[in-house]
Protein backbone atom coordinates (compact mmCIF):
# COMPACT_ATOMS: atom_id res chain seq x y z
CA UNK A 1 0.00 0.00 0.00
CA UNK A 2 1.24 3.47 -0.92
CA UNK A 3 1.21 6.16 1.77
CA UNK A 4 1.51 9.73 0.48
CA UNK A 5 1.81 11.22 3.98
CA UNK A 6 5.02 10.23 5.76
CA UNK A 7 3.24 10.03 9.12
CA UNK A 8 0.81 7.44 7.69
CA UNK A 9 3.73 5.42 6.34
CA UNK A 10 5.46 5.50 9.74
CA UNK A 11 2.24 4.44 11.49
CA UNK A 12 1.86 1.45 9.12
CA UNK A 13 5.23 0.01 10.19
CA UNK A 14 6.08 -2.15 13.21
CA UNK A 15 7.86 -0.24 16.00
CA UNK A 16 11.34 -1.63 15.30
CA UNK A 17 11.79 -2.65 11.71
CA UNK A 18 14.19 -2.76 8.80
CA UNK A 19 13.46 -0.59 5.76
CA UNK A 20 14.84 -0.26 2.27
CA UNK A 21 15.44 3.23 0.88
CA UNK A 22 15.51 3.92 -2.85
CA UNK A 23 16.95 6.78 -4.86
CA UNK A 24 15.03 6.25 -8.11
CA UNK A 25 16.64 7.76 -11.19
CA UNK A 26 16.34 7.57 -14.96
CA UNK A 27 19.17 5.06 -15.36
CA UNK A 28 19.78 3.69 -11.87
CA UNK A 29 18.15 2.90 -8.54
CA UNK A 30 20.30 3.55 -5.50
CA UNK A 31 19.51 1.10 -2.70
CA UNK A 32 20.16 1.49 1.02
CA UNK A 33 18.95 -0.63 3.93
CA UNK A 34 18.46 0.04 7.61
CA UNK A 35 19.38 -2.16 10.51
CA UNK A 36 16.63 -4.25 12.13
CA UNK A 37 15.81 -1.60 14.70
CA UNK A 38 15.46 1.14 12.11
CA UNK A 39 18.23 3.34 13.48
CA UNK A 40 21.04 3.37 10.90
CA UNK A 41 20.92 3.46 7.09
CA UNK A 42 23.68 1.77 5.10
CA UNK A 43 24.32 2.14 1.36
CA UNK A 44 23.92 -1.25 -0.33
CA UNK A 45 24.07 -1.20 -4.12
CA UNK A 46 23.09 0.56 -7.31
CA UNK A 47 20.76 -1.24 -9.68
CA UNK A 48 21.24 -0.36 -13.36
CA UNK A 49 17.68 0.02 -14.61
CA UNK A 50 16.57 -2.26 -17.41
CA UNK A 51 12.92 -3.29 -17.34
CA UNK A 52 10.54 -2.91 -14.41
CA UNK A 53 10.26 -6.70 -14.02
CA UNK A 54 14.02 -7.15 -13.73
CA UNK A 55 14.42 -4.12 -11.46
CA UNK A 56 11.57 -5.17 -9.16
CA UNK A 57 12.84 -8.77 -9.02
CA UNK A 58 16.21 -7.52 -7.76
CA UNK A 59 14.51 -5.30 -5.18
CA UNK A 60 12.34 -8.19 -4.01
CA UNK A 61 15.47 -10.37 -3.64
CA UNK A 62 17.03 -7.70 -1.43
CA UNK A 63 13.84 -7.36 0.60
CA UNK A 64 13.44 -11.12 1.09
CA UNK A 65 17.07 -11.56 2.12
CA UNK A 66 17.01 -8.83 4.75
CA UNK A 67 13.64 -9.09 6.52
CA UNK A 68 12.54 -5.68 5.22
CA UNK A 69 9.11 -4.40 6.32
CA UNK A 70 8.76 -1.17 4.33
CA UNK A 71 9.95 0.62 1.20
CA UNK A 72 10.87 4.29 1.20
CA UNK A 73 11.30 6.16 -2.08
CA UNK A 74 13.05 9.50 -2.32
CA UNK A 75 10.67 12.01 -3.91
CA UNK A 76 12.64 14.48 -6.05
CA UNK A 77 10.61 17.64 -5.50
CA UNK A 78 11.62 20.91 -7.12
CA UNK A 79 13.31 23.44 -4.84
CA UNK A 80 10.00 25.33 -4.51
CA UNK A 81 8.31 22.14 -3.25
CA UNK A 82 6.34 21.48 -6.42
CA UNK A 83 6.37 18.13 -8.19
CA UNK A 84 7.75 17.81 -11.70
CA UNK A 85 8.22 14.96 -14.17
CA UNK A 86 10.77 13.14 -11.97
CA UNK A 87 8.24 12.98 -9.13
CA UNK A 88 5.65 11.59 -11.53
CA UNK A 89 8.11 8.88 -12.63
CA UNK A 90 8.86 8.02 -9.00
CA UNK A 91 5.16 7.79 -8.13
CA UNK A 92 4.54 5.60 -11.21
CA UNK A 93 7.37 3.29 -10.09
CA UNK A 94 5.79 3.12 -6.61
CA UNK A 95 2.40 2.21 -8.13
CA UNK A 96 4.01 -0.57 -10.17
CA UNK A 97 5.94 -1.76 -7.12
CA UNK A 98 2.73 -1.89 -5.06
CA UNK A 99 1.41 -4.47 -7.54
CA UNK A 100 4.24 -6.90 -6.74
CA UNK A 101 4.56 -6.42 -2.96
CA UNK A 102 2.21 -5.86 -0.03
CA UNK A 103 4.81 -3.91 1.95
CA UNK A 104 3.97 -0.32 2.88
CA UNK A 105 5.52 2.17 0.45
CA UNK A 106 6.26 5.73 1.51
CA UNK A 107 7.98 8.83 0.19
CA UNK A 108 10.63 11.15 1.61
CA UNK A 109 11.58 14.56 0.26
CA UNK A 110 14.99 13.94 -1.27
CA UNK A 111 15.89 17.50 -2.21
CA UNK A 112 19.67 17.93 -2.06
CA UNK A 113 20.35 14.32 -0.98
CA UNK A 114 22.63 13.73 -3.97
CA UNK A 115 24.40 17.03 -3.26
CA UNK A 116 24.98 15.95 0.36
CA UNK A 117 26.20 12.52 -0.75
CA UNK A 118 28.55 14.08 -3.31
CA UNK A 119 29.94 16.45 -0.68
CA UNK A 120 30.53 13.60 1.78
CA UNK A 121 32.31 11.56 -0.88
CA UNK A 122 34.48 14.55 -1.82
CA UNK A 123 35.39 15.10 1.84
CA UNK A 124 36.34 11.42 2.04
CA UNK A 125 38.70 12.05 -0.90
CA UNK A 126 36.87 9.54 -3.09
CA UNK A 127 38.06 9.41 -6.70
CA UNK A 128 35.78 10.69 -9.45
CA UNK A 129 35.40 7.16 -10.85
CA UNK A 130 34.48 5.69 -7.45
CA UNK A 131 32.05 8.56 -6.74
CA UNK A 132 30.23 7.78 -9.99
CA UNK A 133 29.96 4.12 -8.93
CA UNK A 134 28.55 4.76 -5.45
CA UNK A 135 26.74 8.12 -5.57
CA UNK A 136 23.25 6.65 -6.06
CA UNK A 137 23.30 4.21 -3.17
CA UNK A 138 25.04 6.73 -0.92
CA UNK A 139 22.26 9.21 -1.77
CA UNK A 140 19.72 6.47 -0.97
CA UNK A 141 21.29 6.11 2.48
CA UNK A 142 20.97 9.88 3.07
CA UNK A 143 17.29 9.67 2.08
CA UNK A 144 16.67 6.66 4.32
CA UNK A 145 18.60 8.11 7.29
CA UNK A 146 16.56 11.31 7.14
CA UNK A 147 13.35 9.28 7.25
CA UNK A 148 14.60 7.06 10.09
CA UNK A 149 15.51 10.14 12.14
CA UNK A 150 12.07 11.64 11.50
CA UNK A 151 10.36 8.37 12.49
CA UNK A 152 12.31 8.27 15.73
CA UNK A 153 11.20 11.85 16.43
CA UNK A 154 7.53 11.05 15.63
CA UNK A 155 7.55 8.00 17.90
CA UNK A 156 9.21 9.83 20.80
CA UNK A 157 6.62 12.65 20.75
Curated annotation (Swiss-Prot):
Q: Which UniProt keywords apply?
A: Cytoplasm, Hydrolase, Nuclease, Ribosome biogenesis
GO BP annotations, alphabetical order: rRNA 5'-end processing
Q: Cellular component terms, GO, for this chain's entry? A: cytosol
Q: Has keyword DNA-binding?
A: no
Enzyme class comes to: hydrolase
Where does this protein reside within or beyond the cell?
Cytoplasm
**SMART domains to which the protein is assigned, alphabetical:** YqgFc
Q: Which Pfam families match?
A: RuvX
Gene Ontology MF, one? nuclease activity
Q: Known EC number(s)? A: 3.1.-.-
Q: Does the keyword Nuclease apply?
A: yes
Query: Belongs to which family?
Result: Belongs to the YqgF nuclease family.
Name the PANTHER family for this protein.
Answer: POLYNUCLEOTIDYL TRANSFERASE, RIBONUCLEASE H-LIKE SUPERFAMILY PROTEIN (PTHR33317:SF4)
* Known role: Could be a nuclease involved in processing of the 5'-end of pre-16S rRNA.
- Protein known as: Putative pre-16S rRNA nuclease
Q: Which organism is it from?
A: Ruegeria sp. (strain TM1040) (Silicibacter sp.)
